[in-house]
């Protein structure tokens, strides 16, 4: 168990105590509706699964941010997946699935995939930035649609923001991890150590990991600390080369992720 739980502050939505103020309550509900994303499923996937929700799967892999999403696109999704849902935050957006997938790919926004070689694995790319105040609502929406047995979260942060008393620990594009109590897999390489205080995990990745800890769900977060402010090959490859956890540990064939 990592001692880093409690490193972040998570802003849960406040409940109203004044039930007499109906107008203010209505405004609050409208605001919450704007904060929640919407899943638009493909017609074929909806037909296959029927009205069965949440969708059960062995593993949910979340790529939060452009570096993690690009890594999943290159090493995980290329030719081995079908897009099953688009995740949108703008309620005015066109709800046609094919239109959304085409435009979301161009804008590198959020897509939910099902692996064709193992349809028990779901992969969600969340390339666009999710504001801090929306993290809780995104988390609730994700787990209202998907019920995984295990969760793997990939995300990134600037290396300049990592604090350590050991300068040798700060290497170019290094990976650290954080896990819930229920996570028991030894899937990380020997050089992958836990994120230590006073470092923090923020935003959607923190919200998802907190949810998994609360509900005793096995989950691990892999954070790539990158030198570049832009997505580059070195940062993307860090997930593959420096976090050599096995696909078999996530329900896939043997080999490196």
UniProtKB/Swiss-Prot annotation:
One of its GO terms (molecular function) is proteasome binding. Signal peptide: none annotated. One of its GO terms (cellular component) is endoplasmic reticulum. GO terms for biological process: proteasome core complex assembly. Belongs to the PSMG1 family. Forms a heterodimer with psmg2. This is Proteasome assembly chaperone 1.
